[in-house]
Amino acid sequence: MAKQRLDTLLVDLELCSSRQQAQRLIRAGEVFVNQQIIDKPGTEVETTLPIHIKARSPYVSRGGEKLFKALTEFEISVAGRVCLDGGISTGGFTDCLLQAGAKRVYGIDVGYGQVDWGLRNDPRVILKERTNLRYLQPEQLYKEGDAAADFAVVDVSFISLTKILPALWELLQLPREAVLLVKPQFEVGRSQVGKKGVVRDPEAQAEAIFQVLQAAQQLNWQYRGLTVSPLLGPAGNIEYLLWLGIDSYIATPNFSQIIQFAQTVREQFTSN
């Protein structure tokens, strides 16, 4: 029987759009060959065996599902807008923005080579890799005559959002909207992070959200909305989506209200 690497076979069978996507699905344990999980992309498999992939995300990564919830729940329209994706990684947020009608997306990441191949070759995506968003200046991102982004989405790790907000403010033009993925484990002190890097205390989660919100308000951003991510982080952390804007008519929640929200969210996740 003929054999082939599983990652290339998935592409040949048009089950994946790129080898990179295939490798990601395989490593995530989402590919079954003859009803068995194969989690190594280089595994040689018989080409005639039945292959099944778990229900796949409509985006290049499941991060897109997180942003989709925010866009839907907050009723944010990105159609025809120039957007910025801070911490583009594989490109889930960017894919979501493009599918929602964004005109252009500037993707920024400290890493290199992680972006989905299809997005990398999409003329609507302008990549700025090996770049620290915290220190990025507008003149380093935009060419003369280019319209600056007016809407940003941010998903960063191993750095507090409070450190990148000043640069983000300068990179955006009016109406300066932003949706931030708040990851408590990167916002609170080490003493509040439990085993495997998980922040379980709702009050600590609320503190993370409140600190980011306060830092944003110091830059003249205003609160527009808060929701929980529909997906847990890789280690099991509950994550939140914070919507910022200017000239907001929505009352800003106080710390006690955010704690109550985090407690409700915690109860929902633990009861499932």
Where in the sequence are the language-model features?
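Short, glycine-/aromatic-enriched active-site segment of Class I SAM-dependent methyltransferases
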Residues: P184-R200
